[in-house]
Structure formats: C-alpha cells, structure tokens
Design a protein with these regions (language model features):
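ATPase catalytic-site recognition across NTP-hydrolyzing enzymes
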Residues: 3-74
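Generic detector of well-ordered alpha-helical packing
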Residues: 67, 134-136, 206-210
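Mg2+-dependent endonuclease catalytic cores in nucleic-acid-processing enzymes, primarily RNase H-like
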Residues: 83-202
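Acidic two-metal-ion nuclease catalytic site recognized across multiple nuclease folds
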Residues: 215-229
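A residue-level signal for conserved active-site and pocket-lining positions in enzyme catalytic cores
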Residues: 29, 172, 210
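G-domain G4 guanine-recognition motif of GTPases
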Residues: 1-4, 134
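Charged alpha-helix within mobile-element recombinases
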Residues: 195-219
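Short, flexible loop/turn motifs enriched in small residues
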Residues: 75-83
Length: 229
C-alpha cells in the first residue's frame, strides 16, 4: 500500500486495513481484486485457541440464535438446524466461544429449547443477552416479537437480518484471523470447526450465522458494571 497522501490525511487507515478479514485485506490493501470468497479463507481451526477455563473476566456475553423449524426425515436427512452460539468478550479484549448448539427440531421444540437455554445461561453467566434474528417482512417481525414475548424476564434483543452471510461473518472472521478468539473445550467443537472451515461453500452455515451475530452483540455491548469470572 503506497498511497502516501491518504496515509498522511488518515494515519490510522493502514491499521484499519490490516485489521480486516483476509479477503477484504487482499482487495483493499494489496489490490488483489481477483480473490474470491472460498472455504478456508475465513476460518481455520488452528486460528482458535482451545481452553478449559476462562482466562480472564467476562465483560459482556450473548447467545445469538439462527432459527430453523425442520426435523430429520427420510426425505430430508440433512436439513438446516436451529443453532445458537454463546460468546463472551473478555477484559483482555479477546473473545471466547463458550457453547454452541445445533439441533434439528420442530417449532415447538425450538421454543422450549430457547427457554431452557436462557435459564441455563442466566444461572451460569448471569446477565446474558439473547439475540433473536428478525427476517425482513411482517412474518419475520411477528416471529421475533413472539419469541421476545416467550423470553419475557430475560435480556432479549432482536436484529433485522441484512446483507450477505459473508458480509455478516467478516467482522468475526477478522478477529479470528488476528488470533483474538478462543473456544471453550466441548463435545460440540468438531462440528463447529468443520462448518467454519467449510464456509461459505458448505451446505450449512447455521453455526457461522449464530457466531457472527453473537460476536456483533458482545463487540458492541457496553461493559458490565460488575465483572464475573
């Protein structure tokens, strides 16, 4: 990058470019406009550090949901799943994925899972924000409002789903690529890493969507008054 005029006008511009995800950095910093999104360019499992305990105190924590209401049937052996990602921002500025769920459930069971999960999250991490996606249109608004009502008494926010899945994932991917993300060891790790490494070419991206939205929530959240360990 040799635009000296721009660097003089904005000395922080180069640092901002270096903080982008690999694909965007290749385009804007190195002028490589031939690069295309492909599996392995956003996430690799060796970019994450797997830990067994929290390395620092939690500043903000959220569980984001990616919703589906599909069950496994002979005609649909591998449907989209309802997925959720519990992520926290730590006092040291890093991020940790604490838990990921991925289930093929009907609508009634999805609602029960959301309530039970919110109760378990609050018991373990106290002030957890539950993030519900809102699809465009009236049906999306009605579903989000219904789920928010179902979770009355919990800290709930809704967000309208906009932009491509790649655009939504890039801020999280940038932090992962710069070594700022950890994963709590768990039985769900393998399936999570498999899906992330296949993004955006893989058949399913439910966990990627949930993780991207959870990252957005904790990255923007105000710090807690009281930190928890």
């Amino acid at each position: 990058f040799d635009n000296k005029v721009l660097l003089k006008a904005d000395p922080g511009y180069l640092a901002s470019l270096n903080a982008l995800s690999l694909v965007e950095k290749e385009r804007l910093l190195r002028g490589n406009w031939k690069i295309r999104p492909a599996a392995g360019l956003y996430f690799k499992r060796d970019m994450f550090r797997i830990v067994h305990d929290l390395p620092d105190k939690i500043v903000s924590v959220a569980r984001a949901w990616d919703l589906a209401a599909t069950t496994i049937t002979p005609n649909r052996p591998d449907p989209d799943r309802t997925a959720s990602c519990l992520m926290a921002r730590l006092r040291n500025g890093q991020y940790i994925i604490l838990d990921v769920q991925r289930r093929a459930l009907n609508a009634s069971d999805v609602r029960a899972l959301m309530v039970n999960t919110a109760m378990a999250d609050r018991a373990q991490y106290k002030n957890v924000q539950t993030v519900i996606p809102q699809d465009p249109g009236q049906a999306g608004k009605d579903q989000a409002a219904s789920l928010a009502s179902l979770l009355a008494g919990f800290r709930v926010s809704t967000h309208t789903v906009t932009g491509s899945k790649i655009t939504r994932a890039e801020p999280f991917a940038a932090q992962v690529q710069h070594g700022a993300a950890m994963v709590m060891a768990g039985a769900w790790n393998q399936a999570f890493f498999d899906e992330l490494e296949g993004f955006p070419d893989a058949l399913h991206d439910d966990q990627v969507d949930a993780a991207s939205d959870a990252f957005k929530a904790v990255a923007r959240s105000h710090d807690w008054t009281a930190l928890i360990s």
